[in-house]
Design a protein with these regions (language model features):
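Thiamine diphosphate
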Residues: 3-129, 133-346
Length: 346
């Protein structure tokens, strides 16, 4: 059992070493444990970070960086390791493409964590061994960490393939953004208020599937005694596909899915499937704050895409954007009384 150490490594020690030794660009999907490092990167104009929509995509981006002569760094939570197994086994390991994987360890045995991390927490090291990806656990003292990074750098150069550095909770010290405005866009309708409005306009007849993160938590706080709610705690990006499967099996019941922009982007192909089969009873609501709020507020790429147009072009019967409580109320009432599928972008 690992005991969280009160001694932590300053994030500029890690980021500084990697920069001086030619590592970068960075890509990946954020985790709260990695927030300090991501904040450090955001404030360093010499380091580029590309926010990926999924871990598998991040490995593809990293492969391109490697082919371009760079030494990429891929950030991910261990829960996302499964999302990139194919890219690792059929791309990076086959073509011997180097990359430094910074993988956070959630669900470590003996440390309280959320239930969705329990199984992967126990199997992370077994999975890395199975994939024949060498790994080390990051040291929690400055001098030891520097020596470790030097050793790993030599191994990556010699082996020319991925190497994983696993980071436990409490290893990296905090690092706050001096200017957090770029990660905190302002909206006329908050997520919490939107969930209240949605809940108020539904009866007990509809089923609600809510995505992982703060959306499920806030829906639970809003109406935890409501029957017909399914609160996802993991499997990011799967809420709308769960809703689709349920809608197909229960055609006489309205199925509402509360999605987030990060989850929508992670498995955007789901929208094409839903549009193709066109379940008339499905209402897909995307609560978009352009950020991964539950992992520290890092930006997503949703700010430059039109979610409602994507849904419309994929075959949804109706799709639109709402900005105010009155617009959201009207959109919900219309969707409940007309055949779908419907897409509401909040």
């Amino acid at each position: 059992i690992h005991i969280i150490n009160s001694i932590m490594v300053a994030v500029d020690i890690i980021g500084g070493f990697l920069y001086k030794n030619g590592y970068g660009p960075y890509t990946g999907v954020p985790c709260s444990i990695l927030s300090p490092l991501i904040n450090y990167i955001i404030e360093n104009p010499k380091i580029k970070f590309y926010m990926a929509t999924s871990e598998g995509e991040a490995m593809g981006i990293a492969a391109g960086f490697t082919l371009g002569g760079r030494k990429p760094v891929v950030l991910m939570q261990n829960s996302g390791l499964g999302n990139c197994v194919n890219a690792l086994t059929s791309l990076h390991l086959i073509y011997r493409l180097k990359a430094l994987l910074l993988i956070t360890l959630r669900g470590e045995e003996g440390i309280p964590d959320e239930p969705q991390h329990q199984i992967m927490g126990k199997k992370t090291f077994d999975l890395l061994k199975c994939l024949e990806i060498p790994y080390e656990i990051m040291k929690d003292e400055k001098e030891k960490t520097i020596e470790q990074l030097k050793r790993i750098d030599k191994k990556i150069r010699a082996r020319s393939s991925p190497f994983a550095l696993v980071i436990r909770k409490g290893t990296i010290s905090n690092y706050n953004l001096k200017d957090s405005s770029q990660c905190s866009p302002k909206y006329p309708l908050s997520r919490r208020k939107a969930i209240k409005i949605i809940s108020f306009n539904l009866s007990n007849k509809e089923a609600i599937i809510s995505t992982t993160g703060k959306i499920s938590r806030e829906l639970f706080y809003e109406n935890k005694n409501r029957e017909g709610n399914f609160y996802m705690v993991g499997s990011m990006g799967c809420a709308n596909s769960i809703a689709f499967g349920l809608a197909e099996e229960k055609p006489d019941r309205k199925i509402i899915v509360l999605d987030g922009d990060g989850a929508f982007l992670m498995k955007m192909g789901n929208i094409a499937t839903i549009g193709f089969y066109s379940p008339a009873n499905l209402i897909h609501i995307v609560l978009d704050n352009e950020s991964h709020d539950s992992t520290g507020g890092q930006h997503t790429v949703s700010g430059r895409i039109n979610i409602s147009e994507i849904a419309g072009n994929c075959g949804f019967k109706s799709s639109g954007v709402v900005l105010t409580d009155l617009e959201l109320t009207a959109a919900i009432k219309r969707a409940l009384n007309e055949e779908g599928p419907h897409s509401i972008h909040v």
